[in-house]
Amino acid sequence: MATTSDFRNGLCIEFNNDLYTIVEFQHVKPGKGGAFVRTKLKSLTNGKVIDNTFNSGVKITTARIERKTYQFLYKDGAGYHLMDNNTFEQLDLDEKAIQNPLLIKEGQELDVLFHQETGNFIGCELPPFVELKVTYTEPGLKGDTATRALKPATLETGLQIQVPLFIDNDEIIKIDTRTIAYVERVKTDI
């Protein structure tokens, strides 16, 4: 058990029969009345973010979450297949269990979350950035880099995103997994 004074970003709590992580919190002491804590909570089961206010000093049940690194092996009709690199134990996941499945490619590592007391699977977390190869995009015009113009590009996983005009086919680009947006071109050693 913890109280609202123990709140910190990333803390996992049990609230309304669900598991949540604290995304943001603010301790408020108004001039009149008791203190309270405003929070933004993200559900670990469905990814929804809710706002909630706790009275100061309220006891909250914390949840212990275990993170394990798994390697993505392959995808087939049954779902996504991952392997624990330490024990070589395989885990089969439904497509809904991965937040953005088009951002992962074979051999990539993911963090898999388990509830420590029950051992139940909670979810997957992608790394903040991934590097993917551009398989198709229209050719850009030479010298047209002064503006922030974008064009569509198809990546090796089938994902389509907007990239700057200077990106060509077979280039590797870095993508932010939180916003699913182009970040930069990856420099390759030739």
Swiss-Prot record:
Pathway: Protein biosynthesis; polypeptide chain elongation. GO terms for biological process: peptide biosynthetic process. GO terms for molecular function: translation elongation factor activity. Keywords: Cytoplasm, Elongation factor, Protein biosynthesis. The keyword Transmembrane helix does not apply. It is found in: Cytoplasm. The keyword Protein biosynthesis applies. One of its GO terms (cellular component) is cytoplasm. Its main location: cytoplasm. PANTHER family: ELONGATION FACTOR P, ELONGATION FACTOR P (EF-P) FAMILY PROTEIN. HAMAP family: EF_P. Belongs to the elongation factor P family. Involved in peptide bond synthesis. Stimulates efficient translation and peptide-bond synthesis on native or reconstituted 70S ribosomes in vitro. Probably functions indirectly by altering the affinity of the ribosome for aminoacyl-tRNA, thus increasing their reactivity as acceptors for peptidyl transferase. This is Elongation factor P. It comes from Amoebophilus asiaticus (strain 5a2). The gene is efp.
